[in-house]
Structures are given as structure tokens and as C-alpha cells.
Design a protein with these regions (language model features):
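Periplasmic N-terminal soluble interaction domains immediately after the signal peptide in Gram-negative
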Residues: 1-10, 102, 112, 116, ...
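Extracellular/periplasmic, surface-exposed regions of secreted and cell-surface proteins
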Residues: 37-39, 83-84, 280, 286-295, ...
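Non-catalytic regulatory/gating segments with a bias toward low-complexity or hydrophobic composition
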Residues: 49, 56, 91, 109-110, ...
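Extracytoplasmic gating/loop element in the C-terminal half of outer-membrane beta-barrel translocons
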Residues: 220-223, 494, 533, 800-891, ...
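Short acidic/polar hinge/loop motifs at secondary-structure boundaries
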Residues: 47, 90-119
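Short, polar/charged loop or turn motifs at beta-strand boundaries
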Residues: 28-51, 59-63, 71-78, 92-97, ...
Length: 936
């Protein structure tokens, strides 16, 4: 956003197999400067992109350090194939994780959004392209040494949901039990007496001490004098004082014929939860040398080693660290307590004894992750190497030939160990696995550029590329660990599983591009690429994709001369093209077989039919845009309309039962995304001492289903129909609480008439109604940079307006069908009672009433939010102080990541997947750090 204030003639952007001046570019692209990336305190570059470019959505669905974000460019163009954009590093498609890349090494990020911009990458660019350019040295420059150090602290960006206090919990537990006894035929007095007598028994513990064996009286109140002897926070026990350390050193420079850039980096990004974090070590060397006036060679070499501590998360397992920290209420102690005094109990060594709560009700009996996780291991170790070399030959003026070879090597080593001593029914296990991938690319590109009669400019390009990807993996697990503290599988006695496989993918491509401009007013471009993919049958292996684009620099027309006093640029652009998508699996067209076992003998049976006619998914992309700038480029902007029509989408087509198979894959789907993008940047203040720059972008688009294999398809809470959207919720409609009895109600339809029922089981799919979309109406970001002399304040905000989330997290916290010894929301205080009939929270009844939290519109939440993604306060020391120290520049700064978040529901992190499903995910991190940057 606003990465560069230079004129269009000066701005150079990265494009497939080269660079172009922004003024002559007919496609759609957004640029993010390296300073924006380096100011972000995240371990993956993908998480730094949210809010920076119109049309790009980056969803940090896990705050686990070292995890990449889910990135989408102009929506989703497929249902069952990949929706991930192509990442290109220094001109070559990149196969590794973005978390492997040191953000301090990045010079710029260019986002290619339409066919004219990205079609030269062919089938791999169906979902857009994100081009990362790393820093280079400068020819003829003296050696420059730059050191950067950051140190800070991290915590949850959004505090967890507010939960019931112990006193309120016991009161509501009593109330639920009393209501159950009444429902079972007891009188109110009998029910109250029984509830008082059994509340402690139901929860398994008495935090009020033995002096108050029945802490809740027959009126549902605390007995006089009763108070809690402990109030433990499991959230505190499961989280840590996370530290953030980022160190890097960079050396760059060059001679008249060469340039170099060398860097070292170290990152230690500890997670908010115990036993989670990410460490990374980086090295990079970029070298370029002119051996002759007509011959240039270069090499880019990078390597990283990372260790990611990755506890269980993002699911409903009881050992999910996020879920465990939330689900245990404060009256269950972290450490064992004296039931009479509440004092800690100690072992023979004087250490506190962790409480495993075998007395607890519910599924967490016998568990204490606060201790057992300390003896477990869940590590992901990754080694990544990228080696790239090129030769550039200039045989004549305007003609170049470049050959580039690139190797991406990635090795992921996983180790999961559970100890045999601590935990729920511990027996111990050790599992190890390794996944190794190599991606090899070689391309040959010829470029020719010439100007005729000082008016006509042509650029021609032709190339060939070969890509080969190999992956292999194996994993094994053994259980019944016999010696704690030794983590290797051979310490376990029982083989649980062992397996492995290998896959290969090849792509051969031929491509070309032609560009023409006349008098720097009229520009045209055409691209063509043919890909041959090993994923399809030989008869359908080749796909040809194309694009054409044009632009008109209206500002250079003679009739615009009167306006040039205040208008600096006015350009109209348009493009149209087709891009393929072959990311449908390694063996998409082949019949598959499964190996099994029966009666002690090996078996082989068909698991999938061959699909020789399966072919490419295709995106047809339309883009129309207007670029403008005025007032000496103090105000610049872009407005674009786009349409992304996807056809031949991969779906399962039903087969007759006699075939022996339920379905077969086929190209039978169509989708369409269409919308608008807006970008506006300005410099309201520009004086000798003051500079203020502002930038804002916004994207709004719709998703439409054009064709499906059947009239109706269900995907969880989404109903897919022609003319609808992939993101449309269809749910039972919540009708609130019956004020007469406190029971939950839902709407249903009887011969078209809308009625109310308390019987959830009587509802049918015909009663589900369209309930909004998980797709936000508008997404984007805005930034501000204010400078005064040596002081600069920079901030980047991201936002979303509209759309809905389905909050699965909250259904557990709002369960009123028995509290079951798991934490509950403070909102239950507002439950229905005879004295509080006007409420949206049903009455509490301690019996099986799962329908109270069953799927309905009750759990939809507005996903609108505003987040202060990054903010930096930087001070550049005066040069007069640095000269005696022979220093070029010294900057000290304070940075914050995810400092502030404003959303519609307390406790909910609003950055959730595009499908809107919230499910016990590791929350985003807030990081505040102090740093210094020194240039020698």
C-alpha cells in the first residue's frame, strides 16, 4: 500500500520472467514495500500481507508461531482443487513454507491478480501470484553492514471469553439440578433439598472447604460465611510469558562489475501457550557478476533450519491445549489442595503436586496438561535450501537470453512423544516421521526490445520451462514406553503403525509474450502458455492458456493538456485471459487400489475408477481498471472491476450402485467471483520537517455458483445451489426463549406458514433458511505514516465489514443442559428464570438437552472487525551524533503487532477461515518489542 511515491515511469514492478515499468503494465498488480514486511512481527510473510493490497485476503487461522496464513486473491476459484496462490521467489516458483523466509531479506512483494499479469505462469497461477523479491547488493557501492535486533513479549491478541466465577457456577449448578428434580416429579421443596445435598457430589469437589459441606442453601444462595479457598486460572497455567527475539545481520555492496548481499538471521518466537513456539536460523547469499559486457552470471543461495513446538490444537480433542485451558473452571485446582484449608499439598521434595482431578465430572477427569505437556514432545523440525543460478547473455542491443536453474529442498522431521507417567491412562508412545520434497526448475527465456521511429516500442519474449517435483515420506509409531525421559521409538515395546509413500509431478511448458506501445499512450500485450502436466491422461495432458490486455494513458493525449496542471496521470486498463488449474492430485486420472488384510492374508482392491477424460480446471479472468494521480502525485488511486469465472471444476459424480463405486470425479462445476477494488493514497502534508502519508484499500466481491453436479449439495452448514454462493449459511432459525417456561424455540414451516416449536428433533432440512454469508461484504486495510524530523509513527490497520461467523467455540460455553464441570460463559447469569422471562438464554436443566446448543442461527456472529495490525514508533538519531562513531544510521524503535482488536463478540478472534467456522483454534498473538537498527 503506497509502497512508492515515484512517477509511473520510474516504478519498476516484478512480472513473470522479468520486470516492467508500471506505466507500460497492462495487468493488475499490487506492491508492498519491504519496509512494511520487516515492520511486522510474525514468523511467516503470509501473515504480514493482510490489509496491504486490495483483492488479497490473508486469514491467520492459527496464531501458532511458524504457521503460514491462508491467502486468497480475488476469492476462491475452485471447490476441490487447490485455492492457494503461486509463490515466486526471485523469479522462480517456490515450493517451501513462507515461514522459512527471513522478512528482513525481502525487498518487495508484488501481487499479480489478473490474467494479463499472471498467465505466463500458466496452470500454477490459477489462483494468482505472489512474487517475493529479495534484497540485492548495489554495483559500485562500498560495503554496507546493517544490524537489526528486536526483543519483546507476546500474549493473546484477544482475551478469552469471560467465564462464570466459582460462586455463580455453583449457584447455577444447583439451579440446574433443582429444575431436573422438578421435571422428574419432585416438589419444589424436595427438589431444592436434593440439589443442595448433591451439588458438591455432582462437581466432584468442594472449593468452600469441609466446613461447608453444602455451600448452596435451599434458596440457591451461598450459605452464610462460605467463600472459596482457591480460585485457579487454567488459562494462566496453560500460557507462558512468551518472549520474542529477532536478530539479523546483513552485508551488501559491489564493485563496477559485481554486487553481493549476504545475511544471517535468528528468530525465537515463543507461543502464548506452554510448549509452543518457533525458532528459525537463516542464511542467504545473493551474488551477481558481469563477467563480460555481454555476459552476466548470478547465484542466490538460501538455507534455513527451524524448530516448531506444536502442541495439539485446532480440534475437539481433550488434549487440545486451547480447549483444555478454556474448559476447566477455576474451582478445579491446578495443584492439589487441602480440602479443609485450601493450602497447597507438597510431595517429599517440597514441590507442589499437580492435581489430575480423577474426581472431576466430564471428559477431563484424570488430565492435567499443565504438567503432562512438560514431559511430552511435539516437534516439527524443518530444513530448507534454495539454490538458484542463472546465466544472462546479451548478444546484441535489445536481445537477451537467460537460463535459470533452481532447486528447492525441504525436509520436515516430526517427532511426537507422550510420556508414560503423567496423564490420563498413560502408556506412552513415540512417533517419528519424515517428509522430504525436492522441486527442480530450469527455464530458458529470450527477450527482445526495440524502439522504431521513436514512437513504436515492442517487447517480445519466448521461453521454455521444465519443472519436476518429488516427495517421499515415512512415519512410524510405537507405544508402551518402558523408560520415561528417553524419547526414541525403540524405548516402546508395541508397534502401532508404520508406512510411507512417494509421489512425483512433472510439468513441461512453452510460453511467449508480445507487448507494443505507441507514443507512450497506447499499450497492448498478449501472452500464450502451453503446459503439459503429468497429472492428466496423455490425451488431455496439454492445456493452452492465454491473455491479452491493453491500456490507454489518457493523460498523454493532447486534449488533456489543460488538465495536466493538476492531473498527473489518468490511465484506463483492461485485460482478459484464461488460466488453468492442474492441482487436483498427483494421479487424478488413474485408477487407484488399496492394500488391506483379510484372514491373515494381504488383499488388493480397487478404491477409485480411472478417469481418463479428466482435464484442467479453467479460470476466465476479466479486469478493467483506472489509475489516476493528481496534485503533483500527492493523491493517487486505482479503481478496478474484476470477474473470475471458473469452469470444468472437479466434483464427484454419482454412479449407479451396480458399478461397485458410489461416485467418480468429473469436470462438471462452474463458479464466478466478481467485484470491485479501490486503492487511494495521499500525502496531505509534505514540508521540510513534516510528512504525513495515508493509504486505504477496499475490496468487495460476490461469489456465485453457476453449475453443480446436482441441484443441491450440502457442505456442513452451507447449502450449495445454482445462483447461490459457496458461503451461504442455511440453518434452523432461532426463535428465542419461550417466556412461559424458559425452553428454547426454533421456527419451522407448515404448508408455508411460519410457526414455532420447542422440539428440535422435529425439524427437517426444509425448515432451514438462508441465514447470511461467511463472506465479508468489504475487506481491506489502511495505513498512516507521520514523520517529524527524525521521529516517525507508522500504523497499519486491517478490517472487514459484514459477513458472519459460526461460533462453535461458544456453543460449549453456553450449554444449559447441565454444566457438567466445564467452564461456562458469564452470559448464563442472564438465563431464564420465573423472575427473568425476557431473555435469550434458556433455563438451566441438569439433564441431556443437547438441542439447547444445536445448530441454528443463534450461533452466528457478525465477523466485522478492525485490527491494528502493526504500529511502529521510530527515532532516527541525528547524523551529527553518529559521525564521530563512523556510523551511517542508527534507528531505535518500538513495534507492536495486533495491538488492538475491535469486534462484535468478546473473546472471539475475528480472523477466522473464509468458510466462517470457528473451532478451538490457536488465537492470534499480540507482540510488543523494542529494537535497534544500525548501519555501518
Amino acid at each position: 500500500m503506497g509502497a512508492d511515491e515515484r512517477s509511473l515511469e520510474e516504478i519498476v514492478i516484478s512480472v513473470p520472467y522479468g520486470t516492467r515499468k508500471k506505466a507500460s503494465f497492462t495487468g493488475s498488480a499490487g506492491i508492498v514495500g519491504g519496509e512494511k514486511i520487516s515492520s511486522s512481527q510474525v514468523s511467516s510473510v503470509s501473515k504480514a500481507l493482510q490489509g496491504t493490497v486490495a483483492g488479497l485476503q490473508s486469514f491467520s487461522t492459527s496464531g501458532q508461531p511458524g504457521e503460514d496464513a491462508n491467502v486468497y486473491i480475488r476469492g476462491v476459484g475452485s471447490v476441490n482443487a487447490s485455492t492457494t496462490p503461486l509463490y515466486v521467489v526471485d523469479g522462480i516458483p517456490y515450493d517451501g513454507k513462507l515461514a522459512n523466509i527471513n522478512s528482513q531479506d525481502i525487498a518487495s512483494v508484488t501481487v499479480l491478480k489478473d490474467a494479463a499479469a499472471a498467465s505466463l505462469y500458466g496452470s500454477r497461477a490459477a489462483n494468482g501470484v505472489i512474487m517475493i523479491t529479495t534484497k540485492q547488493g548495489q554495483a559500485g557501492a562500498a560495503p554496507s553492514i546493517e544490524l537489526t535486533a528486536k526483543y519483546g513479549f507476546s500474549s493473546r491478541a484477544v482475551a478469552d471469553y469471560d467465564q462464570l466465577s466459582t460462586d455463580d457456577y455453583f449457584k447455577l449448578q444447583w439451579e440446574g439440578m433443582r429444575n431436573r428434580y422438578i421435571n422428574n416429579g419432585k416438589t419444589e421443596a424436595e427438589a431444592a433439598t436434593l440439589a443442595s445435598a448433591n451439588t458438591v457430589k455432582a462437581l466432584g469437589i468442594n472449593p468452600y472447604g469441609t466446613a461447608y459441606p453444602q455451600p448452596i442453601d435451599q434458596n440457591g444462595n451461598l450459605v452464610a460465611g462460605a467463600h472459596t479457598l482457591w480460585d485457579d486460572s487454567w488459562e494462566d497455567a496453560m500460557t507462558q510469558n512468551a518472549h520474542y527475539t529477532d536478530l539479523s545481520a546483513r552485508v551488501s555492496g559491489g564493485s563496477k562489475t559485481s554486487k553481493y548481499y549476504i545475511s544471517l538471521g535468528y528468530l525465537d518466537d515463543q507461543g502464548a501457550y506452554i510448549c509452543s513456539g518457533f525458532k528459525r536460523y537463516n542464511v542467504r547469499t545473493n551474488l551477481t557478476s558481469d563477467l563480460k559486457s555481454w555476459l552476466q552470471v548470478g547465484m542466490n543461495l538460501s538455507a534455513s533450519h527451524s524448530i516448531q513446538s506444536y502442541p495439539k490444537q485446532n480440534d475437539t480433542r481433550t488434549d487440545n491445549v486451547v480447549l483444555f485451558a478454556r474448559q476447566l473452571p477455576s474451582f478445579y485446582p491446578v495443584y492439589e489442595r487441602d480440602p479443609e484449608t485450601g493450602a497447597y499439598l507438597y510431595d517429599n521434595n517440597g514441590n507442589k503436586i499437580y492435581d489430575y482431578g480423577n474426581y472431576r465430572s466430564g471428559s477431563y477427569a484424570g488430565m492435567n496438561l499443565a504438567q503432562s505437556m512438560l514431559y511430552d514432545k511435539h516437534d516439527r523440525k524443518r530444513d530448507a535450501v534454495t539454490a538458484q543460478g542463472f546465466v544472462l547473455v546479451k548478444p546484441m542491443e535489445g536481445l537477451t537470453y537467460k537460463m535459470t536453474m533452481n532447486l528447492d529442498y525441504n525436509s520436515l522431521f516430526t517427532h511426537d512423544y507422550t510420556n508414560p507417567t503423567y496423564g490420563k491412562r498413560p502408556i506412552g508412545s513415540s512417533a517419528k516421521g519424515n517428509t522430504r520434497t525436492t522441486g527442480f526448475t530450469i527455464n530458458n527465456v529470450v527477450n527482445y526490445q526495440h524502439t522504431f521511429a521513436e514512437k513504436h516500442d515492442i517487447t517480445l519474449m519466448a521461453g521454455q520451462e521444465y519443472y519436476e517435483y518429488n516427495t517421499s515420506n515415512f512415519s512410524g509409531e510405537r507405544s508402551n514406553v518402558i523408560a520415561d525421559g528417553y524419547y526414541e521409538p525403540d524405548v516402546a515395546s508395541t508397534l502401532v503403525d508404520f508406512g510411507g509413500n512417494a509421489d512425483q509431478y512433472k510439468l513441461l511448458s512453452f510460453f511467449g509474450n508480445a507487448e507494443y506501445s505507441y507514443m507512450k499512450k497506447y499499450y497492448a500485450s498478449v501472452s500464450l502458455r502451453s503446459d503439459g502436466s503429468s497429472r492428466f491422461h496423455p490425451d488431455h495432458r496439454w492445456g493452452t492458456f492465454w491473455s491479452f490486455g491493453g491500456s490507454w494513458r489518457i493523460i498523454n493525449e493532447k486534449f488533456m493538456e489543460p488538465a495536466t496542471k493538476w492531473l498527473n496521470n489518468l490511465t484506463l486498463r483492461a485485460s482478459y485471459g484464461a488460466q488453468g488449474n492442474d492441482n487436483v492430485g498427483y494421479y487424478a486420472y488413474q485408477a487407484l487400489y488399496s492394500i488391506g488384510k483379510f484372514d491373515g492374508e494381504a488383499t488388493l482392491h480397487a478404491s477409485r475408477l480411472a478417469t481418463p477424460n479428466l482435464t484442467w480446471e479453467t479460470n476466465l479472468n476479466t479486469n478493467i481498471g483506472v489509475d489516476f494521480s493528481m496534485f503533483g502525485d500527492r493523491l493517487t488511486g486505482t479503481v478496478e472491476y474484476f470477474e473470475r469465472a471458473s469452469k470444468d471444476l472437479l466434483f464427484s459424480r454419482s454412479l449407479v450402485p451396480s458399478s461397485g463405486f458410489s461416485s467418480i470425479d468429473d469436470n462438471i462445476g462452474k463458479l464466478k467471483n466478481y467485484g470491485w477494488e479501490f486503492t487511494l493514497s495521499g500525502t496531505p502534508i509534505h514540508t521540510k520537517d513534516w510528512m504525513w502519508k495515508l493509504s486505504v484499500n477496499a475490496t468487495t466481491y460476490k461469489n456465485e455458483i453457476v453449475q453443480l453436479p446436482t441441484e443441491v449439495m450440502w457442505s456442513g452448514s452451507k447449502k450449495w445451489v445454482k445462483g447461490g454462493s459457496l458461503y451461504d449459511y442455511y440453518l434452523y432459525e432461532w426463535a428465542g426463549v419461550n417466556p412461559d417456561n424458559g425452553n428454547p424455540q426454533w421456527y419451522y414451516y407448515d404448508n408455508g406458514e411460519k410457526k414455532v416449536t420447542e422440539d428440535y428433533s422435529s425439524l427437517t432440512s426444509d425448515d432451514k433458511v438462508k441465514s447470511g454469508s461467511s463472506l465479508p461484504d468489504v475487506t481491506g486495510g489502511f495505513s498512516t505514516d507521520i514523520s517529524w524530523k527524525g521521529l516517525t509513527l507508522s500504523a497499519l490497520f486491517s478490517y472487514a465489514i459484514g459477513g458472519k461467523l459460526y461460533n462453535n467455540d461458544y456453543t460449549d460455553l453456553m450449554g444449559v443442559g447441565g454444566l457438567n464441570g466445564s467452564s461456562k460463559s458469564v452470559e448464563l447469569i442472564n438465563r431464564w428464570t420465573p423472575e427473568n422471562r425476557n431473555t435469550n438464554v434458556p433455563k438451566i436443566v441438569d439433564q441431556q438437552t443437547s438441542y439447547f446448543t444445536s445448530s441454528s442461527t443463534r450461533w452466528l456472529v457478525d465477523r466485522s472487525y478492525l485490527r491494528l495490525k502493526t504500529v511502529t514508533l521510530n527515532y532516527s538519531l541525528p547524523h551529527s551524533l553518529l559521525q564521530p562513531l563512523t556510523l551511517k544510521d542508527v534507528n531505535v524503535f518500538i513495534q507492536a503487532e495486533n495491538l488492538l482488536t475491535f469486534s462484535h463478540q468478546q473473546g472471539l478472534d475475528p480472523e477466522q477461515p473464509l468458510n466462517g467456522t470457528v473451532s478451538y483454534r490457536y488465537p492470534a498473538m499480540k507482540t510488543i518489542s523494542f529494537g535497534i537498527n544500525v548501519k555501518l
